[in-house]
Amino acid sequence: PFEVSEEIDLGPQLKFNYPIVDTDNILSNQIRNPKVSPDGSKLAYTSFSKIYIKNLPHGEPQRLTSLNYGEGMPVWSPSGNEIAFVTWDEKDGGAIYKASITSKNRVQKLTNENGVYSYPVWNNIGDRLVFIKASHNDFDNYGSLGVDSKLMWISSKGGENNFIDKTNGRSNPHFIKSSERIFLSSRSNGLSSIRWDGTDEKKILKVTGISVYGTPGRKSPPSPATYIIKSPKKEEALAVINNDVYVVTIPYSGLKDLSINVSNTENSSFPARKLTKFGGEFASWGANGDNVYFSLGKSLFNYNIPIAKADDQKILKDKKDNNEKESEIDKKDKAKSYQAAEVEIKTYITKNKVEGLILLKNARIITMNGKEVIENGAVLIKDNRIVEVGETNKIQIEDSQLTSLKTIDLSGKTIVPGFVDTHAHVRVSRNIHKAETWSFAANLAYGVTTVR
């Protein structure tokens, strides 16, 4: 062993005192799987593991159903009158349901087999739903769909599951102008399509982005698209790469392995456009193929491609009128360039209220007051607030509070402030959230109360 004396410059401490307000409600910080209705007037999305619908842009969110299961991945029928979605329950497993938005409380379970369902999508006629069904065991143990997941379909009226093909890493099934072929996406093979019997796979397009930092001395390959979805009306596709959303033109080339790199969209091999400034999630097409919707946090973004193209042409025309070169893009031009329209989606649920008086006594307390350690200390908690920390025999409790006081003797134990892990790998299931997540409990057991 050896020691080295070294001076290292540090930047300013990033510390913010955020107020924590006791309110009756909790505001959701994220909307998931947002889907806009075919006519563009309504939004269905997942928040707090329940599906909500609202009128755009400023309607009040309402629960779609009164089910007690976890809900997710809503998708509109072609008519816009029904929404299909998946459910999950720790005991009963998952299913696919549909709900009518024109007939109140009309909810129907479509699947007979319990399992792990995801990525439901209607065909263009509206008489079938295609989806992925995965292993219950893989989902329980790893939170993933697993290698044995299957692509299947079911009648929109309900019934038996019908096998199409193994997913083989493919996901995000979708349809375009007709329902003759099912389009799929995978990180390794990009966008492809198959027939309803799983045959005649046609590889259409691969999209890659920047090369992220890897290992010193070893160059990382370009990042593949997380998923690619073809436009329902046009020869375009959206691609999500490293949480940024792009739209690329699909040229008719006759090539079997068509690929494009969008790390610099101005130099891409065929037209491409970056839609996001700070990133985006859960990207999807509008029914007309003119709009791409995505979310970030609790905001929904609507990117209108024809308007964006028109704005670009106007900026170029202004440059030519002013005898400027096309390459001379200044801050003023960037400020004038098209930006996706943003709507903040505010979803609230009632907060569980914690009431009572608890004394944790006779513990060794490592405080946040410098290096102070209280060997025989106590923590007094009222409702959901720590009101006093000090030596056990110095904690003052009013006589009127003694009857409601709950005391916990922690002799031989140590109380520490909760740890913040800013690079936690909690391994949660990404698409279907569980009510009970063992990785959260394991982190909490080791004192981690905040993760990022």
Model-derived segments and spans:
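Non-catalytic propeptide/linker segments at domain boundaries
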Residues: A310-V354
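Metal-associated gating/positioning segment near the N- to mid-region
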Residues: K413-R452
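Histidine-rich, glycine-flanked metal-binding segment
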Residues: K371-V416
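Signature of short aromatic-glycine-proline-rich micro-motifs recurring in repeat-based ectodomains
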Residues: V21-K35, G217-I228, F278-A283
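A flexible loop/linker signature enriched in serine peptidases of the S9 family
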Residues: P1-D9, I26-N29, A44-Y52, L56-P57, ...
